[in-house]
Amino acid sequence: MEQAMLNLTFRPLSSETWPDFEALFEKHRGVQGGCWCVYYLCKSTEFNRLGPEGRHGFHKELALEGRASGMIAYEGETPVGWCQFGTPEVLCQYSRGRAYSKLDIPPEDKPSWRISCLFTDKHRRSRGIAIFTLHAALEEIARRGGGVVEAFPLDAPNV
């Protein structure tokens, strides 16, 4: 399916687009048990302490301050997809994992960016929205200087 056939457009997360991100995630109860795409932005103890409402507020604060990155997909004017990206310093949770810390990554292969989450509205899945959103996020990363992009695939069929 072609992007044009889906009438998709993309906008980076910002204070202007926060209400669209919020609408998409509120429709799905914060996604993944109220994560609000915060899990990789903080320590797991902080994530647990915040709870769903606190995570919502935490991500909103980061977005309004320009410290959260991601790409929102729109079908017409409706937000239908999301791809979170950021630097390793921002998406720091991966680096804290035991397995990751044991990796011997050569300096030239160290990531400049990470992609942590992809989400598509449950009523619009299986139409290719996620792949187009991923491509839009990669284009935005390139626009911001590019470099090595690290991603961690995870299948969450019940989301």
PLM regions: where:
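Conserved N-terminal entry element of GNAT/NAT acetyltransferase domains
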Residues: M1-C42
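Conserved beta-hairpin
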Residues: F21, A68-C83
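Short, solvent-exposed beta-strand-terminating loops
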Residues: E22-G30, C83-Y94, E139-I141
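A short helix-loop-beta-strand connector motif used in the catalytic cores of GNAT acetyltransferases and
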Residues: E46-I72, P88-Y94, R114
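Conserved acyl-donor/pantetheine-binding loop and adjacent beta-alpha core of acyl/acetyltransferases
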Residues: E61, T78-R125, V159
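Conserved hydrophobic beta-strand within the GNAT/NAT acetyltransferase core sheet
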Residues: I115, V149-A151
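Conserved acetyl-CoA-binding loop-helix of GNAT-fold acetyltransferases
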Residues: I115-T120, S126-A142
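Conserved active-site alpha-helix within GNAT-family acetyltransferase domains
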Residues: A142-G147, D155-V159
